[in-house]
């Protein structure tokens, strides 16, 4: 486990990382969904990537799981998260010759934004379960994800979103069973 200090406009905070495997030629930094999800749903990768000799790094973004949880809404912007990923990359010694970035869902958008700003630092980019356009994703959510939800659950989710009450624990209680299998 390596805890990395991250400098932000609101001060210095710590983010949690954990390396699995050892392959100086092939290192994959995992960007989880959310924001504010956790690395834990990537733990199944130990059964697949590890035996293939692929080194990968779990990483809880600021505001997630084992990392610091600042109460400053100004930190929750994509550009700041991109700079956070760059600080993590530097602290872990990842470079163009060995650094692959894997992003899933929100982490996919973050990975794309990182690659657009810092293409010189990457050997490869992997985007999973995400479109490269927020408007396209919003349309997909409206046409595919929402109709699959229980109407009462969807109504409660939309009410929470209308209030912009995303920190409400009920919000994740409603969304997780609708979008993730047990």
Language-model segments: residues:
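Serine-hydrolase catalytic machinery in alpha/beta-hydrolase-like enzymes
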Residues: 65-73, 143, 160, 171
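Conserved hydrolase catalytic core segment
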Residues: 96-141
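Active-site loop/oxyanion-hole signature of alpha/beta-hydrolase fold enzymes
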Residues: 58-106
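Structured loop/turn residues at beta-strand edges in well-structured enzyme cores
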Residues: 23, 52, 83, 94-97, ...
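Conserved alpha/beta-hydrolase catalytic His-Asp/Glu region
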Residues: 161-182
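Flexible "cap/lid" loop of the alpha/beta hydrolase fold
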Residues: 125-166
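Conserved HGGG/HGGXW glycine-rich cap/lid loop of the alpha/beta-hydrolase fold
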Residues: 7-69, 74, 89
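An N-terminal hydrophobic leader/cap segment in hydrolases
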Residues: 1-3
């Amino acid at each position: 486990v390596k805890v990395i200090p991250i400098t932000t406009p609101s001060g210095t905070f710590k983010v949690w990382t954990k390396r699995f495997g050892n392959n100086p030629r092939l290192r994959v930094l995992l960007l989880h969904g959310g924001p504010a999800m956790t690395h834990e749903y990537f733990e199944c990768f130990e059964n697949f990537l590890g035996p293939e000799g692929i080194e990968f790094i779990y990483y809880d973004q600021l505001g997630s799981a084992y990392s610091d949880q600042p109460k400053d809404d100004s930190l929750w912007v994509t550009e700041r998260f991109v700079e956070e990923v760059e600080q993590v990359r530097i602290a872990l010694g990842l470079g163009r010759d060995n650094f692959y970035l894997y992003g899933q869902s929100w982490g996919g958008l973050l990975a794309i934004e990182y690659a657009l700003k810092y293409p010189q630092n990457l050997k490869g980019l992997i985007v999973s379960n995400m479109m490269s356009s927020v408007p396209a994703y919003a349309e997909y959510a409206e046409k595919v994800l929402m109709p699959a939800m229980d109407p009462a659950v969807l109504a409660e989710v939309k009410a929470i979103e209308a209030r912009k009450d995303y920190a409400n624990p009920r919000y994740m209680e409603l969304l997780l069973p609708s979008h993730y299998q047990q």
